Structures are given as C-alpha cells and as structure tokens.
Amino acid sequence: MEEACLIRRLFTDLKRVTDLQKPDKIYLDNSNLLYVLCPQRPEIGTVREAFFANQLASAGHTVEYAGYKKGDFRIDSGPVIEVGGADKGFSQLEGQEHSFVAADDIESASMRKIPLWAFGFLY
C-alpha cells in the first residue's frame, strides 16, 4: 500500500528497520483522503501531521517519527518538528537542538515557528 502511495509508514530509527518491524506511525499518504474515508470530520491533528509528512517526503526528505514526548517528526536525521495549531508551544521540544514548530492557522513565521502552509511549496 505504501508503494501505491496510499499510506506512509514512519519509524523511529530508520537504521534499525527490518522488513517485519511494525511501524511507529501510519498515516494516509494524502491528507485529503482522510476527508473521504472518515464518516465524520477527521481529527485535525492527524490531518496536519499527514499533510506535513506528505509534503516533506514528496520533496525527497527522509521523514522519521521523532518518538514520544520528543516532537512529531525528525527530518533527514536532523531537525525535530512538532506540528500543531496556532497556540502550539515549545514544551515538547525542550532540550532538543534544531527544533521547530510547524503551526497551522498562522500567516507568517516568527522565531522557530513556521506556518504549516509554507511546507506546501515543497511539493
């Protein structure tokens, strides 16, 4: 299903992944599919995370699951990104070097907070 671009599997450490290993997270590859497949409105956090993972992976970046309480994603084994709404803070990213928040419902970047829509230009 991943080769058909229906799902995206995320692992915590890609260096240790085996064929039989269970992924840490599974997202639909295209966030628009969530609106088609959910009988009610999909969880907005899942939509944001699916969109973010899709945009960066489509641009050729390696997207890993950052781990519990460490942010949402690790990009190219480097920066950690937490995805959330406009009020999302940096508490989950404490102690993480090169960490950023990709925030929905904001128009422009400030400090380490980047608008989620800006990642759409990577596609």
Give residue spans per PLM region.
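Conserved catalytic cores of phosphodiester-cleaving nucleases, focusing on short active-site segments
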Residues: F52, L56, G71-D87
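Domain-level recognition of nuclease-like catalytic cores that cleave nucleotide substrates
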Residues: E107-Y123
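Hydrophobic beta-strand segments of well-ordered beta-sheets in folded domains
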Residues: S77-V80, E97-V101
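Active-site flanking residues adjacent to catalytic metal/cofactor-binding acidic residues
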Residues: D29, I81, A103
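A structural signal for short secondary-structure junctions
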Residues: L20, L56, R74-I75, L93-G95
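Active-site-adjacent loop/helix micro-motif of nuclease/hydrolase catalytic cores
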Residues: I44-V47, A86-G95, A109-M111
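Accessory nucleic acid-recognition modules appended to NTPase machines
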Residues: M1-G67
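Short, polar loop motifs at secondary-structure junctions
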Residues: G67-D72, G84-F90, A102-A109
